[in-house]
């Protein structure tokens, strides 16, 4: 087995997308060295070069007025690469930045920022304007390190001088050649002639890279007999002078040829690109048509097709026709409550359901739902205040979008209300049926519970004829100005949740006032829409994870959301790591994910309640007899030895723990000594012998495996455990055309439903059990959730396959091991006792901050959907300082936790740190509570908050962090942090030193660089 190399992820070129990206970051490295230089010796001037079009500007990365920090440097660019000025800014890694100074524009507004860059592998950067909030972007790789690529995003600039900063966020960023800026909103009123045709080969179009005009086979029937092909490796085709008489929404029909499924990114007027996966045509001589909607401004427009560094279809022509209107009509959202007089009602415990002349109301103790049967729209209110208005449902069936509002009949029958009792409690199920001639029935289903602050909403599409299929079912959609209004405007945020914990993904608490590049901010499975100041807010998310990957798209302004779509069928290269579309769910009846919607006085309570709602559907994995149910304590090999693991090192570690840490670093006598990847450096006999030594020392042995990945390239290699019946070429996951899916993280995905895959798992895991291992870390599980063509014909989606594969693992292990999911989706969650809350942590201060970002917004998983949240190991010797090493211990202790060290015990400095930092009884007791601390603040963007709190019976614990290498003073409002009276006296005990102090109202904490503090807090009456 080989561990992945993080910097060289090996993604397939042809499937790199620049649109529909969930925000993810590498990691944040605090405490830069402070080195700051100005680019010197550049041939270009710092001033902008005004382009031919008004409102366009170009700035060179090597301009003398720019500022470089950290390792950033100006270097030469190969002549063949074609860098403007012959130079680039490179070395953007490990805490470096490039700032373009004096970006001067005449007009304030939204500008399209085009970055000309070079990146031989996929890399990211953070962009901030005028010192404002930093946004993260994931750039696709260019063909190689000698090929330029282009990436577009939108920024808001003020009139006059501006600064634009590119930050590597502690990771690795591309080399930057230059940036171009173009005013985006320079159009006026006006629609094109219906059905206007624009040829790809037209003389005024602009082709870049490999793109070229070529002949088209006569049988294909291309208009004009020609097409534009070779859209690969960083090429573009731009249609110029797309004329519109008035601004509005238009249907764009793309006539194309593609013998295999290929994506293409499309941008209008140099705006944000959106990626579309065009289905394959019958062959490379057959035309296909793909239709979508775009917004055009009055006058001349441009439409650009970009291969994103991969492979895109050949383009014959475009046809543009008016779609009608200037945007989607939200419907009569302000008249939803006009439903006439009440006709009849029934009570079900504390829930009252009332039928009205033109609608119905469903009312619980906490909330009410009003459904208008004339408009097909719903409104949700809590405590008498409407927070959501204009809610409806949609489903994409092949090329037909079903919209519940557009059905001719919306019916509700009181007699059809069902009493229910399930894991959520007692309640009712209410169904609204939408019917139209010639369309399948769409059912909107609400489940209300007597004792829950949330309700559940889902949808079904039911066909009386042929089966229907969809990979986009949205039971909750809002498209109305101010459609979601939580009623406050202190510091309104939307939480963006990553699908898994791979590639150093981060959560983001983004300002609700985000209306640009929103495809970058799709949240996976759940979100919170809240005011950080008052903490009130909505929590919305899926509670069923048997079929769908759920996405949440949103857009907002003026402290409200104008768009919200919660849908099953979400895939993204950077979030779910899928390289093809979500699988289609087919049947006479197809059902969406079930979505919980709740409002809370404290969004943190809401997130925990959301976790409980999921556990009500799929409880966390139980501890079977013989598996200790307490916090796992011990050691893992990866941080210490990586690929150099050996039998002698395992024995040395086991002996060291017995001789030095047995009495202090343990959970009631249980200590795990775990071998990570490269355990197969040991022979079978050495593995058996190592387990014997570990057990003799009074410890338990742990092991590692990646059940859904293949690290090799030999598709003829026999699969172990199958007696030669299957090769890896048989069990790797493929697309519908039979093509092997590209590597992700350097590994091929294995089909969890294939019998060869399952036999492999049985063969390896039964050996582990036979050797005597009692703990297993299973890694790269996200590969098992990829969309593809699975062996089991009943499996239509990646999540269905994942459920099957994980259930098979549980069955094979038979409850005899502690199961820790490492790189894994957050959901489904019922197959592991613990899950890593973040990606790999190497012990440095920057990685600790990154890990605590995941705790800041993901703590609620602890004790709800997982018994424990795993902060990854503590490699103390890599902290860089004693303070940073101690901070790593504090971070692990408050995280929920799997309490594992990962130091090289032959290193004298590591030994000292282990003996000093792993033996504090009071600190270890906090870790053994097994509860994750809550964040005090939730307004940190992609960073971690610096104050966390845990209430333990009558007492509290408080953790305070300094993520920089400079001294810092933290002032903590005790009422906000602990909820205590402003006049209450509080006794603080420093957990590490035992020092006591008494304070009230606020606490001032003086921290050295990289230092953190843990306090026990007693509130005196």
Go through the PLM ranges and name each one.
Residues 187-191, 331-367, 385-438, 442-559, ...:
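Polysaccharide-binding surfaces and accessory modules of carbohydrate-active proteins
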Residues 23-47, 52:
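Sec-dependent signal peptide cleavage junction
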Residues 103, 121, 240-242, 260, ...:
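Carbohydrate-binding surface patches
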Residues 47-334, 980:
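Extracytoplasmic
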Residues 633-648, 674-682, 743-759, 786-799:
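The substrate-binding groove and active-site-proximal loops of carbohydrate-active enzymes
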Residues 718-747, 751-755, 759, 804-909:
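Glycan-recognition surfaces
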Residues 415-417, 434-440, 450, 454-456, ...:
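Conserved structural scaffold segments of CAZyme catalytic domains across common CAZy folds
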Residues 999-1021:
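C-terminal beta-strand-rich structural cap/linker in extracellular carbohydrate-active enzymes
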